[in-house]
Every structure is written in structure tokens, then in C-alpha cells.
Amino acid sequence: FDQDSDGNMNPVLDAFLEERENGRVKHIGFTGHCSHKAHLHMLAQLKSRGLELETCQMPMNLVDPHYDSFITNVLPELMERKYGILAMKTLVFGRLLGAGPENLRKSHGPTGNLLEEGFKLSDLLGYVLSLPISSLVSGCNTAAIVRENTTIVRDFKPMTAEQRDALLARTESHAGGKMEYYKKKV
């Protein structure tokens, strides 16, 4: 993030706030991919202006807590401020499965495959579903993936903290952000 961008963000935010006041916009949220620090900066800016938005969309997945974490650093603040939380990048565009678009594999290199390490798709999605989220955004590009995700959600049972911690312990070797190509140092 760039603090100089505040000058660009404030007029845009003000325009949306005005439209919300006029009834043309119902809810306003924010999102970002690169750094939890940008989210915390946005929340601080809003607080300094005495404002709150309704939602925040951010990357949340089973490797996130090991590196520059949105879950560890931003989620508690969002919960305290009663935001609707939208989890994205739950499978890191397929990279947790050793897949993803060819151009991404070329530009960011290969990654591990958590399925080959004994994880199930229900572990990966279930971990995020067990966090205090309002919605899980899953990129589905085939009907088969929609059906598979639907089955996982239908059969979902929330994980205990111990179950989540056990899964996290198994992904510790993926710390450092290699799988999470979108994270940038700021």
C-alpha cells in the first residue's frame, strides 16, 4: 500500500458514502490482496474519520497464518468492529492443489500440492468455514467444482480450535508466501 494513495481513496470513499446517504448504495466494503498492512491502514483511516464500512473481503486459507497473515492480523479487528467478512483466495487460485493457471505457474513457479500431502479439499475449505466469516468466495470454473463445493458445504461440521491448529501445524513448511503469490512485501 502507499500512504500517498489516501488522497486518491478519500474522494472515492466520500462519493460512495454520499451515494449511500442518498439511498443509491446500500452497503460499502473494501478488499485487497497484497498485504494485511493495507487493510489495517484502511481500518485506521476509517476510524480516524469516525466511519465504518460493512464488509471486508480478504485472503483467508490454510497457509495464510504462517506468513504476513490476514487471519492473524486483520480478522480480530474486523470481528471487534462487527464487519461482514468475506473469505477469498481460499484455495489460492488452485495453487494449494498444485494447480492454477499456466501463466501463474510460469511466473511464480511450482508450489506444493496439499492434496498429495494428505489433505482433503474438505480440510482446506473447512478450515476457512470454521473461522468467523460471513461468506466464502470460491472461484468455480466448472459445474463439477460447484457440485464438489456444494457437497463440502452441505456436509460441513465446524472444526474445533484444536482441529484447526492440527491442520496449521501440517502446513508450517509452506510458510514464506511461496504459495500465496499475491502477497507483496510493503
Regions found by a protein language model. Give the residues of each.
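Beta/alpha (TIM)-barrel catalytic core signal, keyed to glycine-rich beta->alpha loops juxtaposed to Asp/Glu
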Residues: F1-V186
